[in-house]
């Protein structure tokens, strides 16, 4: 049985850990509220943008712009992977990386070359260890970013697609559903023609008057569409990270409470055993004196 001092030290250590996990839970909760507000502010713009672009895409054929063209042969696949820079958020990063690696291995099995564009340290480090090529690695920005990050990454992906370095591009990110649910999402973003036309045909008919011509607008809006998709994925991933960390720290705090309870019980049992031994020594000594 451990000594009373050892048990006291363990209890003190667990209490300090509980203070840290509780503080991290509160910080994650505050950051989650901010991330949710950013998503709510951006969502109406994104939805209107998607609707208008879908209508535009339905009025043009694949030759209207290179980003609408579906290539006959897909040789190289680019995967844009968004993860967090920090850990302590449960299985959040592991699920995203697992989804990305599963996709990469599937593409590789089809004879395609796979190239990664990673945002976040966790994804970058794991993908490099998995021996896949990391073309771009952006770190230490998931905690605080704006549209410029998506703009920079989007421009690079678009340039590589237009020059033939990539034949298709897929975005892997964490969709924020609720504080208790975050899902790894695989979203093809290039080429965009087929999916946007399908959406436009399924949507209620709307009459738009476009000036200048459709082709001119597509040249301006299609690159921005890619950037908007990436930015929305980054916003969702950021909110999902904070929600996952909040849940992980809440579970850790509860585990600390359970451990403190178990250690306190052990402390009381140890102290009781010590008192019993002392009483037995006293009684034994008294009996010896009587004898």
From Swiss-Prot:
GO terms for biological process: proton motive force-driven plasma membrane ATP synthesis. It is found in: Cell inner membrane. One of its GO terms (cellular component) is plasma membrane. The keyword Cell membrane applies. One of its GO terms (molecular function) is ATP binding. Keywords: ATP synthesis, Cell inner membrane, Cell membrane, CF(1), Hydrogen ion transport, Ion transport, Membrane, Transport. The keyword DNA-binding does not apply. F-type ATPases have 2 components, CF(1) - the catalytic core - and CF(0) - the membrane proton channel. CF(1) has five subunits: alpha(3), beta(3), gamma(1), delta(1), epsilon(1). CF(0) has three main subunits: a, b and c. PANTHER family: ATP SYNTHASE GAMMA CHAIN, ATP SYNTHASE SUBUNIT GAMMA, MITOCHONDRIAL. HAMAP family: ATP_synth_gamma_bact. Belongs to the ATPase gamma chain family. This is ATP synthase gamma chain. It comes from Nitratidesulfovibrio vulgaris (strain ATCC 29579 / DSM 644 / CCUG 34227 / NCIMB 8303 / VKM B-1760 / Hildenborough) (Desulfovibrio vulgaris).
């Amino acid at each position: 049985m451990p000594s009373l001092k050892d048990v006291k030290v363990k209890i003190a250590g667990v209490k300090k850990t509980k203070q840290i996990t509780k503080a991290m839970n509160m910080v994650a909760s505050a950051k989650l509220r901010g991330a949710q507000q950013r998503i709510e502010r951006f969502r109406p713009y994104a939805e209107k943008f998607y609707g208008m672009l879908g209508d535009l895409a339905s009025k043009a054929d694949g030759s209207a712009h290179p980003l609408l063209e579906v290539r006959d042969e897909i040789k190289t696949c680019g995967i844009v992977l968004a993860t967090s820079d920090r850990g302590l958020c449960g299985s959040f990063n592991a699920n995203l990386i697992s989804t990305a690696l599963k996709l990469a291995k599937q593409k590789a099995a089809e004879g395609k070359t796979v190239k990664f564009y990673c945002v976040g340290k966790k994804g970058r480090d794991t993908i490099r260890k998995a021996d896949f090529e990391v073309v771009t690695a952006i770190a230490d920005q998931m905690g605080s970013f704006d549209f410029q990050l998506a703009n920079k990454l989007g421009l690079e992906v678009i340039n590589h697609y237009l020059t033939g370095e990539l034949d298709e591009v897929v975005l892997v990110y964490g969709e924020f559903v609720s504080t208790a649910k975050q899902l790894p999402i695989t979203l093809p973003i290039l080429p965009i023609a087929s999916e946007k036309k399908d959406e436009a045909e399924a949507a209620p008919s709307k009459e738009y008057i476009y000036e200048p011509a459709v082709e001119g607008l597509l040249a301006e809006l299609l690159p921005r569409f890619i950037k908007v998709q990436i930015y929305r994925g980054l916003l969702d991933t950021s909110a999902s990270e904070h929600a996952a960390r909040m849940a992980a720290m809440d579970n850790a705090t509860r585990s600390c409470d359970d451990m403190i309870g178990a250690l306190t019980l052990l402390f009381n049992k140890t102290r009781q055993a010590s008192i019993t031994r002392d009483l037995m020594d006293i009684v034994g000594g008294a009996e010896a004196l009587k004898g």
